[in-house]
Amino acid sequence: MSTNTEFRTCPTTGLKVDLAAEKLIKVNAVAAVVFLAIGGLFGLLVALTRWPEVHLLPADWFYLALTAHGLDVLLVWIIFFEMAVLYFASAVLLGSRIAAPKWAWAGFGLMLVGALITNVVVLQGGSSVMFTSYVPLKAEPGFYLGIILFAVGALIGCFVFFGTLVVARQERTYQGSIPLVTFGALTAAIIAVFTIASGAIILIPTCLLYTSDAADESS
């Protein structure tokens, strides 16, 4: 199958790198580091508040910072980084073109928009439900919408990874079995699909319910 995919050869490792995959790896890795820094900042605020001599934030801002810290450190940065690893372990290590790069960019866009929406909603107050957001804690509908969009984008990234493995197999870009790192990434992607999909499915009725409640309160 002929394609217009552009490659370069890494001067250090000698690996053949799909330029489209390289860009996706970079943007996902950068987004991961940015949200790790944001989450770390919120974590510092939480730590300074827990320090009795400082006690930086009042109670409402403490739980706001704790919620943002949990989301960015335990969810957003980890999954952005996982997407970068998945694209590296498939396209780069197997010397393959990435499957459906437009879908991969769409997934990244959804993840970025979702993460930004959730962070903004948390900073606006009224959504300090912490990372677990257990009942009866209730957040604004945008909080759940942002997480759902982020989850859908991550699922798209996982399926692009699976597709890239298929492309590499069909085009015989590697010999024998897949490398151990790629096998580990495959295992992580399978686990991610089940966990992310189940989380998103649970949040969809929650988002719809709270959106309906918000509409009733405003009417």
Predicted features along the sequence, with ranges:
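Alpha-helical transmembrane segments of integral membrane proteins, especially early/N-terminal helices
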Residues: V27-G43, H69, W103-V121, A192-A200
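Short, intrinsically disordered terminal tails adjacent to the first/last structured region
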Residues: M1-T9
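Hydrophobic positions within alpha-helical membrane elements
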Residues: L74-L75, F194, S218
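Membrane-interfacial loop-to-helix junctions in multi-pass inner-membrane proteins
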Residues: K16-V33, L93-V113, P136-I147, V166-I191
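Alpha-helical transmembrane segments and their membrane-interface junctions
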Residues: G125-G126, I196-L209
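Conserved small/polar residues in nucleotide/adenosyl-binding loops
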Residues: Y210-E217
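N-terminal signal-anchor module of multipass membrane proteins
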Residues: C10-D72, V76
